[in-house]
Amino acid sequence: MRVAMVAYEVYPFAKVGGLADVVGSLPKVIEKQGVKVTVFMPFHKIVSKNCEKLGLEIKEVARAISLPNLQTKEKFDLYKSTVPATNVSVYFISNDYYFSADNVYEGPDLAEQSIFFSNAAIEAMKYLSETFDIVHAHDWQTGLVPVYLKTLYRTDPFFNRTATVFTIHNLGYQGVFNPGYMKFAGLPAYLFNIDGLEFYGQINFLKGGILFSDIVTTVSPTYAQEIQTEQFGEKLDGVLRLRAEDLYGILNGIDYSEYNPATDKRIYVNYDIDHIEKKKMNKSELQKELNLQVRDDVPLIGMINRLVDQKGLDLIEKIVDYMMMFDIQFVVLGTGDKKYEEFFKNIEKKYPQKISSNMKFDVDLAQKIYAASDMFLMPSRYEPCGLGQMYSLRYGTVPIVRYTGGLADSVKEYDPKTRDGNGFGFREYDTAHLLETVAKAVYFYKKEKDHWGKVVKNAMKTDVSWDRSAKQYLKIYQEALRKKQF
């Protein structure tokens, strides 16, 4: 089986969020199942820098390939590299006008960029003369890939046997634009209707991916159910219910070779489940680095997030002073809404030896926080999958979560009677339940040392690898091919 993955960001070439981790890791494990995977992504400005840093070669494949379907004279060049330690080829769609911004999701026109990339990825496949059984597109930026394949390329013999899979990583980001972009995209006018791309008078790229792909997946079983409800459906719940028979939730995993406390070079001291006492050394070193009091008797709570409403930061705003009464330390890493950045800067000033606010994106510091923290806080309003809780489990850092989406699928409440469970959580989205859950975790840390040791070991034993998920994706690909045949 041959699979083409199309995504806007892929680790280690360009990373902004969890999408890059997923599309960087999934091909590796699918490849081990005997599937040949090829990845297509834009040649963002950061790609060259990252390849140079990693010693990865970039080869020129072709220049000035035209896009006859689009209303543009812009052409694209094609370059190639390889995902490290694999045989997975990565092809870069290069165009100086669309992909020369410093940041991945910036540029002259996000709608045009996504249209250009989606069509260019398809034309790149044709140029390479590589036929694919599956084209697997990710998120709204590639939502038009299934649309193109089911319309303008429907009778193209090159894609005659190609089935499509579309993955929703976060329904909150849909790519909604002025309908005038239909003309630029070269798409037929009849697609602008309620059963097509039309969405409250606009066009919706994500809706296109949902309606025109053979199979739709999202990133956890619970989230797949949630998004079919009005509460979580972001006005697409009706469309998703229409595709319910073809909608699957597959929990993401993490790359165990990349995230391994026993070998991770970015943390202070390596450790494993048999030498878990060394985890404390990471804690004291991080406390020193961040100018916190060096104390093992107080729990260190870490939080690494985009600083946006989705992540439950409005709850933290209201209870942080009460949290400090528990005698804890709190480390925050992330960027986002200015109001939250200012909030975290201000509480650091208020509690200088207890709180460290780091308003930046720093991969190395993130790894240190995962390894050094006793607990990891994720009180999300909604969370399609979440990777932070998986990294924390891998490093023996006990997650405190709101049970929603992938958090509900990966974190199980610790039960002192059965000594089963790997974390602590709450369901109702309010300050009282969050504060109660933090208090519970702090109590176990300070007063129930035996139970705390058990929940830490349970966390480290939790399987959050890609292996199980990769097998599920193989079944999905086979199902997509079966549907394509009808």
From Swiss-Prot:
Coiled coil: none annotated. Pathway: Glycan biosynthesis; glycogen biosynthesis. Transmembrane segments: none annotated. This is Glycogen synthase. Keywords: Glycogen biosynthesis, Glycosyltransferase, Transferase. ADP-alpha-D-glucose binds at K15. The keyword Transferase applies. It comes from Pseudothermotoga lettingae (strain ATCC BAA-301 / DSM 14385 / NBRC 107922 / TMO) (Thermotoga lettingae). It holds the Pfam family Glycos_transf_1. Synthesizes alpha-1,4-glucan chains using ADP-glucose.
